[in-house]
A protein has these predicted regions:
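Beta-propeller-forming repeat regions
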Residues: 1-397
């Protein structure tokens, strides 16, 4: 609200609520200047969305903080594209939806998980970087009056993944911002590439008014559904007659289960990259893709922080993740204990072992921050889902 103290914006979301549930409304808490927060109910538009993130920035250069609200999913209909929003501040802390004024495509950008505002083209206004599931690392260039989708132009077309988070920083010290992006990783039963993507089909296959999702992956050049027969029959009972036994279902491709018309009428989304990755910016205004080292691919990454942790003059990366909410046949993703990657000064990284880094972070990490305390000492805080915060101090040497 521009009164000189920090306020708190809380994004709400979840799959357990209907699309008009009050629990999906975001909340804004205004600071009274003495560390006490009061919820402001009149300053935000009523947006019922399963949100994932908020990215604050003065994107219109009028001196106040505006907001991008990223939506994660449509409740009960995973795979469908939710609506995201651009909110403009009127100067006194009231926000209005202006998505259509800057780019209507922004509303349907995808299943957003994270976003950030950066001036990637050095023209003194902020551009919007968005990541999410089944979508590319997406760039909207701010030309002062419009947010133009330049994803393909900057070399990020076809980067669709299951992206979880993004960190923007000049990692290699060349003066251009780089994008470090957390993904599924490569320690999984499902793989993806440009020629053999992971695919999701979304549709009402049995015409019962409910949306089904079928995820497929390639093996030996053929596309197979990930879902086991009992789970598929539970969702689409009409297939029981077609596949009465497990033997009947075994080895069936997606085209053996559904007709060409059924698949054609379904909404289809692809993912081509599962590697946790870095995209290096350069003087041409484009980004160059590079997967992070193998040690960074053992588990999904949901949190990233950068810093010169070994005081050698080069930026390092610290990654956290894991995900336990997985069905038994896929197995939970729990192989990360915190990954320290030491920058080598030549666009590469040297992974540190647990013994070398001292990190042994258990659980599902969802955020990492670095703080300074007690005579300039540095501490790293790991926030974990349904768990206590884990704290490490950075050694002076």
């Amino acid at each position: 609200d521009g009164d000189g103290d920090l306020d708190l914006y809380v994004v709400s979301g979840g799959n357990e609520y209907s699309t008009r549930a009050p629990a999906l409304l975001d909340r804004l808490y205004l600071n009274n200047g003495m560390g006490s927060f009061n919820q402001s109910t009149a300053t935000l538009p009523h947006i019922y969305a399963s949100g994932s993130c908020v990215a604050p920035a003065d994107f219109d250069n009028d001196g106040d903080i505006d907001l991008f609200l990223g939506s994660r999913s449509v409740p009960w209909k995973y795979g469908l594209t939710p609506t995201s929003y651009l909110l403009e501040n009127d100067g006194v802390g009231n926000f209005h939806i202006v998505t259509d004024d800057y780019n209507p495509q922004l509303a349907s950008v995808g299943m957003v998980t994270d976003a950030d505002w950066i001036d990637y083209d050095n023209d003194e206004d902020l551009d919007l970087i968005i990541v999410g599931e089944w979508m590319p690392v997406t760039v909207f260039q701010n030309n002062g009056t419009y947010l133009l989708d330049v994803t393909a132009k900057v070399g990020l077309g076809g980067t669709n993944g299951w992206w979880n988070c993004i960190l923007t920083d000049d990692i290699n010290g060349d003066g251009y911002l780089d994008l470090v992006v957390g993904n599924l990783g490569k320690n999984s039963k499902i793989w993806a590439s440009e020629s053999e993507p992971a695919t999701i089909y979304i549709g009402d296959f049995d015409h019962n008014g409910l949306t089904e999702q079928i995820i497929c992956y390639y093996k030996n050049g053929k596309s197979y559904p990930m879902v086991l027969r009992p789970d598929l029959i539970y969702q689409i009972p009409m297939l029981k007659d077609q596949f009465p036994t497990h033997a009947d279902y075994a080895g069936k491709q997606i085209t053996d289960i559904f007709t060409v018309d059924q698949l054609k009428n379904a909404i289809t989304k692809n993912a081509y990259i599962f590697a946790n990755s870095i995209f290096y910016g350069n003087e041409t205004g484009t980004f160059r893709y590079q997967p992070l080292p193998a040690e960074a691919q053992f588990s999904p990454v949901y949190a990233i922080v950068s810093g010169d942790f070994n005081s050698d003059g080069w930026k390092d990366l610290l990654l956290g993740g894991n995900f336990y909410g997985v069905n038994p046949q896929r197995g939970r993703y729990d192989a990360s204990h915190g990954v320290m990657l030491i920058g080598d000064g030549s666009n590469g990284f040297i992974p540190m072992s647990i013994q070398e880094s001292g990190l042994n972070v258990t659980g599902q990490v969802r955020d990492i921050i670095s703080i300074t305390y007690q005579q300039g000492r540095e501490a790293i805080l790991f926030a974990k889902n349904n768990d206590k915060i884990q704290v490490y101090t950075v050694a002076n040497n």
